[in-house]
A protein has these predicted regions:
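Catalytic beta-strand-to-alpha-helix segment of the class III nucleotidyl cyclase homology domain
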Residues: 51, 73-179
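Acidic, Ala/Val/Gly-enriched low-complexity intrinsically disordered segments
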Residues: 194-196
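Catalytic NTP-binding/metal-coordinating core of nucleotidyl cyclase/transferase enzymes
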Residues: 4-87, 91-92
């Protein structure tokens, strides 16, 4: 009986695919309110922004795992690539907002974390994902909030400045958070070969 239990536990562990990954979470600020005001225009604007994000994911190695409403969850193998992608996205959204009507403008929050995740089909689970979502909730509109694990890998590979927000309590969990200070898109560099 005990042997069967051990075999069952081993089988269950083998079915679970775990790895360290960089998690990218974003959503639209005030999406529900915008939908109440003008559903069609809000959806058109969101799709336009989503096309921008999809192209950036393709360029920087992001893999989309889940989308729900205005939220997007993606995974990167490189912390540097994820930060580059996030910054470029915010830059392009800022430029887009200058060229469209006020009701068509959109603002995004982004959270980035590197941690342990569980992969099951097209879904990601685990503490690594939860922390990224909490960081996204901490982010300012048009901002990017990242974990200490991201900063440790990215800090010496770019010229970005990070504001240390210290330990932030979100949903009964403390997260050491940073936000990107005065995002400098022109100075952001991506090494020719990068790893997490």
């Amino acid at each position: 009986m005990a042997e069967n239990v051990v075999q069952l536990n081993k089988s269950s562990q083998q079915d679970i695919d775990r790895k360290i990954a960089v998690i990218f979470v974003t959503d639209v600020v005030g999406f529900s309110k915008s939908m109440e005001v003008n559903e069609e225009e809000t959806l058109r604007s969101f799709r336009a922004c989503q096309e921008i994000l999809d192209k950036l994911f393709e360029e920087h190695g992001g893999r989309i795992f889940n989308t729900a409403g205005d939220s997007v969850l993606a995974e990167f193998q490189s912390a540097v690539s994820a930060v580059v992608c996030a910054n470029e996205f915010q830059k392009l959204i800022k430029e887009r907002n200058k060229s469209v009507s006020e009701e068509s403008q959109m603002s995004f929050r982004i959270g980035l974390n590197m941690g342990d995740v569980i992969i099951e089909g097209d879904n990601l689970y685990g503490e690594g994902v939860n922390v990224a979502a909490r960081l996204e909730a901490l982010s300012q509109a048009n901002g990017i909030c990242v974990s200490k694990s991201i900063v440790d890998f990215v800090n010496k590979k770019t010229e970005l400045l990070f504001n240390d927000l210290g330990e932030q309590k979100v949903k009964n969990t403390e997260v050491h958070a940073y936000d990107i200070a005065a995002v400098s898109y022109t100075h952001l560099t991506l090494p020719t070969s990068v790893t997490v």
